[in-house]
């Protein structure tokens, strides 16, 4: 958990150099997580049209569905923020989504069903409709349970704006 403040600080710093971008999006991510070396995770997200702007970042509601090769499922809803970096095609993204984690085995017990997913990433827009990003996410119960191992994932994310 000591790395979370560092990640949030880096995200805040990146936001200071970025400019807003907007559109509703569907995001599909594929990556790996730290339960073992050969585990894979697939994320599916929907981000609404921006509901507000905060420090130049477009903030949207987000719905998240994540499944992995250990038969774990996370379903959550929260907020997502995306900000263009200057006039370039590059952007930074971040999100926070509380939700429900359904473990597929005792090996992936995270302490309780209520979990929180945080995500930070950097990406590039290729046109008005498609972009690709690399993101790191963390799933944890935030210390609400005595047992709180958390899990990290790295995903390559394809975004489709409409």
Question: How would you describe each model-predicted region?
Answer:
Residues 1-24:
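Cleavable N-terminal export/targeting peptides
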Residues 90-121:
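Mid-chain, well-packed structural core segment of small domains
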């Amino acid at each position: 958990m000591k790395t979370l403040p560092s990640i949030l600080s880096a995200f805040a710093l990146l936001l200071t150099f970025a400019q807003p971008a907007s559109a509703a999006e569907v995001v599909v991510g594929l990556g790996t997580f730290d339960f073992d070396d050969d585990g894979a995770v697939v994320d599916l997200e929907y981000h609404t049209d921006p509901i507000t702007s905060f420090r130049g970042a477009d903030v949207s509601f987000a719905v998240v569905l994540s499944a992995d090769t250990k038969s774990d499922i996370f379903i959550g809803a929260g907020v997502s923020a995306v900000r263009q970096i200057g006039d370039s095609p590059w952007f930074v993204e971040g999100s926070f989504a509380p939700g429900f984690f359904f473990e597929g085995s005792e090996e992936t017990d995270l302490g309780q069903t209520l979990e929180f997913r945080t995500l930070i990433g950097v990406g590039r827009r290729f046109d008005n409709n498609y972009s690709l990003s690399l993101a790191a996410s963390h799933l944890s119960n935030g210390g609400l349970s005595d047992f709180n191992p958390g899990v990290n994932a790295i995903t390559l994310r394809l975004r489709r704006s409409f």
